[in-house]
Amino acid sequence: PDSTKVLFTNVTSNKDHRKQKYKDEYVINVFNDKLEKLWEKKIDFSVADKDMIISQSQISSDGDVFILVKEKSKEKRSKWCPSFDYSFLKVTSNGDIEKIKIKIENAYPKHAKLSIDQDGNCYLLGYFTEKKKRDVFRFEHGIFFHKYDSNGDLVLQKKHKWEKEFYVKLKEEYNLDKVSSGADGFYIDGISIDYLQNSISLISTHRYQTFGNSNNGGKGTTSRYNYANHIIISSFDFDGNLSWTSCLEKKSNPMSFLSNMIFGCYNDNIYLIFNALKKLG
């Protein structure tokens, strides 16, 4: 959103073998457009990387840094619910740190991504899982949309459940006897903001795993095959209202399962570029 600020982050591990303590240090450096350092901040994560994972970081036009983190939950939950919580840290140039936990009514965030607009507002979009079990194929029960102002205060929050037709479409295309539900899911590629059309889109890849058995010299082995078969695009207005959702087939094979995707928006169109490798031989 602001080309006059450059954010550089790094993680360093400080190990004290005498005290057998391990502490990760997250280093934030902010530069101007001439690559002159404006400020630096070091954050200690004493809980170690098993309990906290840094998912994403972005910088606002005011020079504040927002860090999205996943933390292992201490709450006892049902097996279909995620075992972690999402929070984001707001770090200012003065060194102040504010932690904001992502809360969804009667649900848990399962995947999340943040984006900051040109006014410093923070948008957090992702998929949620309801606390009450639902008789559906998916573990993700819908999309949530949160908006925070530049101070980190929650402005609005909305959630949208998937239509039944969407679940039916996925269920009919896959042979459930050969699909590992634990590996099946949505993985967010990113968020694209179109200021001309006042829209914000969540772009995701739907992935699933299949298994195959083979016999090698009388010894049976099981192989896994990963596929990224669909791209899901959900577009909202700036008030969090869902405008449309599109499910696009991604021609892919296991080699391109984890290939990166580049995307952008212009004049009410969304452009996607990804590596669709072809099988050789």
Describe these PLM feature segments:
Residues P1-I97, S115-L125:
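Solenoidal tandem-repeat scaffolds enriched in leucines and small polar residues
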Residues P1-K5, S55-D62, K113-D119, F128, ...:
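Structural signature of eukaryotic scaffold interfaces centered on beta-propeller domains
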Residues V6-D24, K70-P82, Y127-G142, T205-Y227, ...:
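Short, conserved, GDST-rich strand-edge loop motifs in beta-rich repeat architectures
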Residues K21-D24, K50, C81-F84, A107, ...:
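Active-site-proximal structural scaffolding
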Residues K23-E36, C81-D96, R138-L154, K219-N241:
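Beta-propeller blade signature
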Residues E40, S57, W80-L89, I97-I100, ...:
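Karyopherin-beta/Importin-beta family HEAT-repeat alpha-solenoid scaffold
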Residues K42-K50, K101-A107, V155-A183, S243-S256:
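Surface-exposed loop and turn segments in beta-propeller and other repeat-based domains
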Residues V69, I143, I188-R224, A228-I232, ...:
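Loop/turn-rich, solvent-exposed surfaces of beta-rich toroidal or solenoidal domains
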